[in-house]
């Protein structure tokens, strides 16, 4: 489970994914208001507090605002401006 949901601007669209442990992992079930669940394979050593990336790169894997825009049927500016202030932003 990660603490981001549709109240944070992460849309309730089938096909959403996040990066955890350098892998693109699918969101399972429905994105809730303040959280969503991620399918993590047993062989991936993930622990509470590990970083989950919504937009960006992690160990060679990436999800761009353009990727989400295509999935959500919108433009990349709407994706980035729609994310709430609760979503931590790290610019590298």
What spans do the regions from the language model cover?
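Active-site anion/phosphate-binding pocket segments in diverse small-molecule metabolic enzymes
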Residues: 1-92
